[in-house]
Amino acid sequence: MRGLLIDVGVVSRRGVRADRDAAAIEMMRKAGAIPLAITNVSEMAIWWESNNKLHGRTRNPYDLRCNAGGSSGGEGALLAAAGSLIGVGTDIGGSIRMPAFFNGVYGHKPSPNIVSNSGQYPEIVDYRAEFLGTGPMCRYARDLRPMLIALAGTEATGRLRLDEPVDLRQIRVFYMNEIKDRSFLMSPVSNEVRRTLSDVIEYLSSLTLKPAEERNFPSMTYAFEIWNSLMMSGDCPKLIEVLKSSGSTISHPFIEMLKWTAGQSKHTFPAVFMTVGEKYLPSKESESSRRYVALGRELEQEFANLLNDRDAVFLCPTHPEPAPKHRTPVFRGFNFVYAGIFNVLRLPVTACAVRLGEHSELPVGIQVVAGRNQDRLCLAVAEEIERVFGGWRDPSKKA
């Protein structure tokens, strides 16, 4: 946003301000939106907890001990706390949808090439631009549609047919309860999330002409490997190179890790850890990477066969558990892939607030996936979920 900070939580960018509005902000201004603030993100917008060395840690309005998500965690927390009504986020691995889930609001990652990503930092202009979505975050589901219309513009809105009514009775509903991952870095789906998904499915089955149908994809077991391999499948800079180009003095991942251990690093642990991880992940030329890229393309086609050319949605958890405590995401690093897999599958997705957990008293929700350019189906189902289940709850009155 012109004149405001664009440091993305990186110490070497302290004080850097934007010299122009991002394209999405321009579109919102044209629609009459009044900017109130920019909000906190994770360092370089790479992690699903919004914490950095410049602005500190964003806390969850429902429980200050808990994570607000990332990378758009500040936006999610501000919306949940009624500090603003609407916001704009970006999502390349769930960065709109996880904050929406953790903070009990709504967020939509649009179909590719609908909302311009131009003017962001770090700017992604390579093949990954189709995985990145700039989209609306709202306290109320009914605000998603007019926001998406404003962000997308006339031509893109026409492609999405957002003005067409959706007959929910005619929609086919498919769902998945859990990703059966083999890694200790992914949590099992909690009972609260499982029950919430089940209740939404039960309601939609009573509404639609055909009952909801469970669909499991064996290749989802490798969701993280698919996401990572597709993200790294082309020519793109490594994180350490991006940090260096931002003015960081980071020289070697292991040296930086030693500095972090001694309290001398200017970077957060997730950023340092990811630079170390880059040295050990398989290269894009490796046999395993090529295999997972092929598996990802097959999975993309399976979803196209399921969702394209008909009114159908796919429901699944946005995240396997409600907002975890601060600093714990590093022990469950793969949890983000419930959201992230749909970035590389290039599908529109809406994170829907449903209710507060019975035991955790934290927001619990689901995500609604549709076929490419079928965003209107996600939004229609989100509005119905809000109407029936209530959506956002005032965190000051949660008890």
Say what each PLM segment does.
Residues 1-93, 307:
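Gly/Ser-rich catalytic/binding loops embedded in alpha/beta enzyme cores
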Residues 8-14, 190, 328-332, 368:
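Short glycine-enriched, charge-decorated loop/helix-capping segments at active-site entrances
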Residues 15-17, 65-69, 97, 125-128, ...:
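Short Gly/Pro-enriched turn/cap motifs at secondary-structure boundaries
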Residues 26, 30, 80-179, 198-206, ...:
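Structural helix-boundary/capping segments
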Residues 35, 211-212, 349:
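Hydrophobic beta-strand scaffold residues
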Residues 41-43, 92-93, 218-219, 320-321, ...:
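Conserved beta-strand edge residues that scaffold enzyme active sites
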Residues 50-54, 101-105, 226-233, 331, ...:
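Short low-complexity, flexible loop/linker segments enriched in glycine and/or proline
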Residues 150-340, 344, 373, 384-399:
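Amidase signature
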